């Protein structure tokens, strides 16, 4: 099979430059060096080509870009003296010769048969006829009997020899003693590729490192036999070497595919004498290469899954095989394909970089590649991400190597574009070191590979054809790429730019499908979840761990909304909340940390682990609290910075259950799709999160959303134990005022307190005494359910607001406070008492279901959240829209409120709560004056001491053992009588303020007093 990259063999023609041209002196030349050097490609037959020189008409030259010229030749003449047959080379004899040919000028040794070096040295005529590559004509000077003699013209053949180690091109030149004077001469022409810089050569004006070919003859004999056996110095004078461009299969020689001025086809020759003296000169052909518009250019890129069965399966690591094929046109009359100057390949949609590849991954610095140097690459083993094989004009499979991940010198890889190095070496002395750029799409992760010439590497893609380049990525769970999630023939798109001359670009953009199998339809989205406390004791502080697991082949996770079990709460006041901008940048302090988040990312069985702290923040995205979860993406040689995920923390107003939700879960970082496999969040701050006090079956419930928009609901059981060990000793007190009226109704205050670390309340039932019924006119003003649901404040103008409440809870730094409303619900006989509490951005609604039976009002708060409450105070005041009214006096007898308080643990406290009535200790029922005597009737509630006094009246007291009505009869004292007499003289009446005080016998109760004014007339 024809190999594409041909090593320029025109330089082989320059081997003739070892033969000097003149025997006689030439007055114009002096010293060692080159007098004339010509190189080019010519038309014509074997006879016509012998006369092809720079002075020939332009029609004599072959100029078609990428074409196969009939002939390629070089002509070299060394410096000499004399003219005609008297020419003699000047300086010392030629020892070594080197010829450098233009980049892209190529020959294909594989198109010819080969001859072994052993056979050539023994008897060149024994080489296969198919190994003949051309012929030479030369002139040389020998000494016969000590006299310089220009030997008759010598001719010989050029044979293609077997390629050897470090020699990609090897030819034998056999001059078989056609002259009766000179014996046979056998020379070896060694060909190389200039892939490394040669500073010494460039100092002499000869370029290097641009992948042109150069050729050396190092075995020029210092002497030959003349006249059948006499040794004589050999001084070459002039030579022409002709390569048959149509030898072999007709395509032995190929011109560069780039067009331009003749200067781009410059060749160089360097000669060296026995003493080491050097001479060099360039040559520029009289005509340039043309016809680039006719050069075909049809490269193809194919991307196929790796060899393993799993590598053809969706969402699996894949040792993808990428092959760039360049069809060759090998016929003698055909124009070959253009060389590739730039290549872009966009991989199939969904075939993306795999985070799992970071496991054990290293990177190779440019210094370790040794660009522009013949030193082999010294990349660390961990940077090897694949293999490369290039099919060129070497034996099949001999140019091979590795694909390495690159990194800046001494620095981590901080983001796209990413660098790769293609390093291929051959035992035949050819090395290719190409830098590539990998640019993933930041939104989709779709990968595009770029191989271009750059300012740093102007010959990154040398002008050397090839028939095939195969890149085979590393296989296994750490493969650099992972397959698309879906099937359906995603396509590879490639774009190539040819070497086609100045200002001319030829582009070709083919697309080929990428086969992926094993795709269910539809693609499933069924993750698994677990959530457990470290300590399952009710009410205990315990770390809480939440896990999500996604199997390969599942849709990718984009959003999470997780509702914690009822009663699983955090002690927010114990944490310093992280503010802005620290929460956004993920730079909170340890005082805000409440846990750790760990993820594994990547396809396959070895996803890469990453972790970061979980910080509690202040308000975020309309939620009272939030989370900031910064994860430093340090993976192998990569440092892609810190990715901060934000989450909201909201509290359900009816259940007080906490919901944590994130809508910005990272799906692509640095152009790399995360392919999240597991997510683990551990809330492990000491004495922060504590368990419910309800031992019933609870659950952690999540709603997941995929990048495809699919949703999944998950529920993980959660249950604690030992609820019975929790104490439950709440204190429940109520109070009202005896100051009631028809206009403003009656008041009621409820105060509930509870020590810390007890079972939390679940429900409260109360039954009001008959003396405190619900107020009908207020019930009729109950707020409609829809209005309340839309905005409770809208209920105020309706007269539905009947009170206020305040709650202190240890889980919030401040207090919750708000209003109490009567709310009517469809189908219910009586409106509920709904209490709206707000504070620290949290809203909680407590619903009391109201019933009225035979004038007695009862209320049940049946669904109190499992939240610790330090104190709860409800005030239902008097007013035009009071919730309650009064029947009769509230001070006539004790008011009792049957009360049942049930704990989340199941414990029950039942009591008959006595309502404390203010403004009701003592009352003056009546009074009258008869002459100089006051008769006053007083009523008390309970046992105690009654004391009565007034100016001009005696102070009297009396103890009562129970609620009593006592009549006092008091006569004016002597002072009182004097005051009365004085008033009469002024024609006035005597008015005396009388005060009645009552001190209850029972300790802890407040005393009371009443007063009135009495009038004495005579």
Predicted segments — roles?
Residues 976-979:
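Short beta-strands and strand-coil junctions in structured, solvent-facing domains, enriched
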Residues 964-968:
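Short strand-edge motifs at loop-to-beta-strand transitions and within beta-strands
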Residues 906, 983-990:
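Short loop/turn hinge sites at secondary-structure boundaries
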Residues 15-17, 25-921, 1018:
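Ser/Thr/Pro/Gly-rich, low-complexity intrinsically disordered stalk/linker tracts of secreted
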Residues 97, 343, 560, 764, ...:
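Residue-level detector of buried hydrophobic side-chain packing
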Residues 1-29:
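Sec-dependent, cleavable N-terminal signal peptides
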Residues 920-958, 988-1018:
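Extracellular glycosylation-rich, acidic/polar low-complexity regions of adhesion-
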Residues 973:
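Residue-level signal for threonine
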């Amino acid at each position: 099979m024809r190999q594409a990259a041909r090593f320029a063999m025109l330089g082989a023609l320059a081997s003739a430059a070892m033969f000097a041209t003149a025997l006689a002196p030439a007055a114009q030349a002096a010293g060692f060096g080159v007098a004339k050097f010509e190189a080019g490609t010519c038309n014509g037959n074997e006879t016509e080509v012998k006369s092809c020189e720079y002075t020939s008409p332009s029609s004599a030259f072959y100029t078609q870009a990428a074409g196969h010229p009939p002939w390629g030749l070089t002509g070299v003449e060394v410096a000499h003296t004399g003219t005609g047959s008297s020419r003699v080379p000047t300086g010392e004899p030629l020892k070594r010769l080197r010829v450098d040919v233009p980049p892209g000028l190529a020959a294909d040794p594989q198109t010819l048969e080969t001859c072994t070096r052993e056979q050539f040295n023994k008897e060149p005529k024994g080489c296969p006829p198919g190994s003949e590559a051309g012929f030479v004509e030369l002139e040389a000077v020998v000494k016969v009997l000590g006299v310089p003699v220009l030997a008759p013209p010598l001719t010989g053949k050029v044979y293609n020899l077997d390629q050897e180690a470090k020699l990609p091109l090897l030819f034998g030149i056999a001059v078989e003693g056609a002259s009766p004077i000179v014996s046979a001469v056998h020379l070896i022409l060694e060909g190389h590729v200039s892939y490394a810089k040669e500073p010494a050569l460039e100092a002499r004006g000869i370029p290097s490192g641009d992948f042109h070919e150069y050729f050396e003859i190092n075995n020029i004999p210092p002497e030959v036999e003349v006249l059948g056996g006499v040794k004589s110095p050999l001084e070459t004078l002039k030579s022409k070497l002709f390569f048959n461009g149509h030898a072999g299969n007709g395509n032995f020689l190929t011109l560069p595919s780039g067009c331009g001025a003749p200067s781009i086809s410059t060749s160089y020759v360097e000669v060296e004498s026995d003493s080491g003296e050097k001479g060099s000169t360039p040559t520029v052909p009289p005509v340039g290469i043309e016809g680039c518009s006719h050069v075909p250019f049809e490269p193809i890129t194919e991307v196929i899954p790796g060899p393993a069965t799993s590598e053809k399966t969706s969402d699996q690591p894949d040792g993808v095989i990428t092959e760039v094929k360049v069809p060759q046109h090998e016929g003698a009359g055909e124009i070959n394909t253009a060389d590739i100057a730039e290549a872009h390949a966009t991989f199939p949609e969904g075939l993306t970089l795999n985070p799992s590849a970071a496991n054990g991954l290293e990177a190779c610095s440019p210094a370790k590649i040794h660009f522009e140097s013949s030193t082999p690459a010294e990349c660390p083993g961990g940077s090897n991400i694949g293999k490369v094989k290039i099919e060129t004009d070497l034996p099949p499979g001999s140019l091979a190597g590795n694909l390495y991940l690159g990194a800046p010198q001494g620095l981590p890889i901080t983001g796209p574009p990413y660098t790769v190095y293609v390093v291929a070496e051959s035992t035949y002395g050819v090395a290719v070191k190409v830098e590539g750029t990998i640019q993933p799409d930041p939104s989709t992760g779709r990968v595009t590979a770029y191989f271009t010439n750059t300012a740093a590497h102007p010959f990154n893609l040398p002008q050397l054809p090839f028939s095939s380049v195969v890149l085979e990525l590393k296989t296994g769970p750490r493969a650099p790429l992972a397959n698309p999630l879906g099937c359906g023939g995603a396509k590879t798109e490639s774009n190539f730019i040819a070497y086609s001359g100045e200002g001319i670009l030829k582009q070709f953009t083919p697309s080929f499908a990428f086969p992926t199998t094993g795709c269910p339809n539809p693609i499933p989205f069924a993750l698994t979840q677990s959530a457990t406390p470290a300590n399952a004791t009710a009410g205990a502080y315990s770390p809480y761990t939440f896990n999500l697991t996604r199997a390969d082949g599942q849709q990718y996770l984009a959003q999470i909304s997780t509702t914690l079990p009822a009663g699983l709460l955090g002690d927010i006041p114990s944490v310093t909340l992280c503010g802005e901008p620290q929460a956004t940048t993920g730079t909170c302090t340890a005082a805000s940390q409440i846990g750790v988040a760990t993820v594994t990312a990547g396809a396959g069985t070895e996803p890469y682990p990453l972790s970061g702290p979980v910080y509690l923040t202040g308000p975020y995205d309309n939620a009272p609290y939030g989370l900031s979860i910064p994860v430093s993406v340090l993976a192998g040689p990569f440092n892609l910075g810190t990715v901060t995920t934000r989450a909201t923390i909201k509290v359900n107003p009816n259940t007080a259950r906490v919901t944590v939700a994130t809508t910005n879960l990272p799906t692509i970082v640095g152009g790399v799709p995360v392919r999240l496999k597991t997510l683990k969040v551990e809330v492990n701050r000491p004495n922060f999160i504590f368990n419910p006090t309800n031992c019933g079956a609870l659950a952690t419930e999540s709603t997941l959303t995929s990048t495809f928009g699919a949703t999944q609901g998950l529920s993980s059981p959660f249950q604690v134990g030992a609820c019975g060990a929790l104490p439950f000793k709440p204190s429940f007190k109520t109070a009202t005022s005896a100051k009631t009226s028809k206009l403003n109704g009656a008041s009621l205050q409820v105060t509930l307190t509870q020590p810390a670390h007890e079972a939390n309340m679940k429900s409260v039932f109360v039954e009001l005494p008959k003396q405190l019924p619900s107020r009908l006119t207020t019930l009729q003003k109950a707020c409609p359910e829809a209005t309340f649901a839309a905005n409770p404040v809208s209920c105020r103008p309706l007269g539905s607001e009947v009170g206020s409440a305040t709650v202190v809870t240890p889980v919030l730094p401040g207090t919750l406070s708000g209003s109490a409303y009567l709310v009517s619900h469809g189908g219910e006989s009586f409106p509920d008492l709904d209490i709206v509490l707000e504070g620290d951005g949290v809203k909680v609604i407590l619903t009391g279901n109201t019933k009225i039976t035979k004038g007695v009002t009862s209320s049940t708060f049946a669904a109190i959240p499992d939240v610790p409450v330090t104190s709860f105070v409800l005030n239902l005041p008097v007013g035009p829209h009071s919730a309650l009214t009064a029947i009769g006096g509230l001070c006539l007898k004790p008011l009792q409120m049957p009360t049942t308080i049930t704990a989340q643990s199941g414990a029950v406290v039942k009591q008959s709560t006595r309502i404390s009535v203010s403004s009701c200790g003592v009352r003056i029922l009546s009074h009258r004056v008869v002459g100089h005597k006051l008769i006053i009737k007083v009523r008390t509630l309970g046992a105690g001491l009654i004391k009565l006094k007034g100016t001009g009246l005696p102070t009297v007291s009396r103890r009562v053992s129970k609620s009593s009505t006592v009549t006092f009869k008091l006569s004016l004292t002597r002072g009182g009588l004097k005051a009365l007499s004085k008033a009469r003289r002024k024609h006035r009446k005597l008015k005396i303020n009388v005060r009645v005080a009552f001190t209850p016998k029972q300790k802890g109760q407040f005393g009371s007093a009443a007063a009135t004014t009495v009038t004495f007339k005579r």
